[in-house]
């Protein structure tokens, strides 16, 4: 079976992605601005010190992506967020916060309120300026979200500045994997006939909201007996809080995985930040192992190691779900699951915050279905309840 993704259109507004940096530290604003503007596809058009100033800046600038600090005087990030989205509903907001339990809680709440992504911010300006991981995450998240926003609005793709001038390229000509995918057909493969023994989920940008939706819908439909393993791209501390939020939404035991945990049916296991989570067979039981092998697709935890491991441990009896996220993590592992006889499904482009991971998985020919987010839980439950 073949389906075709919607072709991205152009134009009305091209040039670099227009960004606003919001942080009460002038030093941090300066460092983030410099990092962003080193990439010619990004332009920082506003830099302000609190949430109130950020809301006011929307009246003066056409802003596409906001880097929003949490703790600020006058108006903090969580208070500013709904005001920003009210003024500019298509705005993409990245919550930037240090790795504390309180900030992780606030960030998860912000994601539920409409923020698109979170970014772990080093605690000192020295760590920010010297951190290549932070620089990479900052730039790539801005580009992914800015590009996704323009595609959704039918605008021109992000383009580079050359000698101070804007060099415009239409989406169809953009030599990026995402733009190429938008014009290629997707071939679907038959789903496995067997009922899966495990459900594996991978997600990144927009993933927490998508996970809450899927698990909330599954709870309404009757929880399956299979265990569920989840890799969501998130730093340590944040995944701890995520597990707690998911448990409240799903109504089943949910926890960050610990090395050596036996896998139990009806439980959800979340890969902890900074650790890959994989499944191993030990005698007659399956267990979870954690490792700090090198990052894959710039991520640890990454989805591909999990998917490879469930294919090895369970063979055909795997259902894998790839939700919204930037990059292509999960696509290679998804192909291995499919070639082992398991079933892989992906979230569709219109319902994804960023159609990177699910798009790559679909385009590589691994999927048996590409579905709107609202239909994923029903598919999972049908598969889980096969006789």
Swiss-Prot record:
Its EC number is 3.1.1.61, 3.5.1.44. The modification 4-aspartylphosphate is found at residue 69. Its main location: cytoplasm. CDD domains: CheB_Rec, REC_CheB-like. Phosphorylated by CheA. Phosphorylation of the N-terminal regulatory domain activates the methylesterase activity. GO terms for molecular function: phosphorelay response regulator activity; protein-glutamate methylesterase activity; protein-glutamine glutaminase activity. The active site is at 204, 233, 329. It catalyses: [protein]-L-glutamate 5-O-methyl ester + H2O = L-glutamyl-[protein] + methanol + H(+); L-glutaminyl-[protein] + H2O = L-glutamyl-[protein] + NH4(+). The keyword Hydrolase applies. Keywords: Chemotaxis, Cytoplasm, Hydrolase, Phosphoprotein. One of its GO terms (biological process) is chemotaxis. GO terms for cellular component: cytoplasm. InterPro entries: CheB-like, CheB_C, CheY-like_superfamily, Sig_transdc_resp-reg_Me-estase, Sig_transdc_resp-reg_receiver. Residues 190-387 form the CheB-type methylesterase domain. Residues 18-136 form the Response regulatory domain. It is found in: Cytoplasm. Involved in chemotaxis. Part of a chemotaxis signal transduction system that modulates chemotaxis in response to various stimuli. Catalyzes the demethylation of specific methylglutamate residues introduced into the chemoreceptors (methyl-accepting chemotaxis proteins or MCP) by CheR. Also mediates the irreversible deamidation of specific glutamine residues to glutamic acid. Belongs to the CheB family. Contains a C-terminal catalytic domain, and an N-terminal region which modulates catalytic activity. This is Protein-glutamate methylesterase/protein-glutamine glutaminase 1. It comes from Rhodospirillum rubrum (strain ATCC 11170 / ATH 1.1.1 / DSM 467 / LMG 4362 / NCIMB 8255 / S1).
């Amino acid at each position: 079976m073949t389906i075709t993704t919607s072709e991205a259109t152009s134009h009305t507004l091209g040039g670099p992605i227009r960004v606003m940096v919001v942080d009460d530290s002038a030093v941090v604003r300066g460092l983030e601005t410099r990092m962003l503007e080193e990439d010619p596809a990004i332009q920082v058009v506003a830099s302000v010190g609190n949430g109130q100033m950020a809301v006011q800046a929307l009246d003066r600038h056409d802003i596409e992506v906001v880097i929003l600090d949490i703790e600020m005087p006058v108006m903090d990030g969580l208070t500013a967020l709904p005001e920003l989205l009210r003024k500019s509903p298509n705005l993409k907001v990245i919550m930037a916060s240090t790795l504390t339990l309180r900030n992780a809680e606030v960030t998860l709440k912000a994601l539920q309120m409409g923020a698109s992504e979170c970014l772990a911010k080093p605690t000192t300006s020295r760590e920010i300026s010297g951190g290549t991981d932070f620089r990479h995450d900052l730039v790539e998240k801005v580009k992914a979200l800015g590009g996704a926003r323009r595609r959704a609005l039918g605008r021109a793709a992000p383009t580079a500045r050359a000698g101070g001038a804007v060099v415009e390229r239409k989406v169809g000509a953009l030599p990026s994997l995402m733009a190429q995918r938008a014009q290629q057909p997707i071939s679907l493969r038959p789903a496995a006939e067997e009922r899966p023994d495990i459900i594996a989920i991978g997600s990144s940008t927009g993933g927490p909201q998508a996970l809450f939706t899927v698990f909330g819908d599954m709870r309404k439909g009757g929880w399956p007996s299979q265990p569920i393993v989840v890799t969501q791209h998130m730093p340590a501390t944040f995944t701890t809080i995520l597990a707690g939020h998911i448990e409240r939404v799903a109504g089943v035991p949910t926890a960050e995985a610990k090395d050596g945990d036996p896998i139990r049916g009806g439980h959800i296991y979340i890969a902890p930040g900074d650790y890959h989570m994989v499944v191993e067979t030990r005698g007659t039981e399956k267990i979870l192992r954690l490792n700090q092998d090198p990052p894959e697709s710039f991520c640890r935890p990454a989805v591909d190691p999990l998917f490879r491991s469930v294919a090895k441990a369970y063979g055909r009896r795997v259902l894998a779900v790839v939700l919204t996220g930037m990059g292509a993590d999960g696509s290679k592992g998804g192909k291995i699951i499919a070639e082992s006889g398991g079933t892989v499904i992906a979230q569709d482009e219109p319902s994804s915050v960023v159609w990177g991971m699910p798009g790559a998985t679909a385009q590589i020919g691994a999927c048996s279905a590409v579905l709107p987010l609202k239909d994923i839980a029903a598919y999972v439950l049908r598969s889980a309840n096969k006789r």
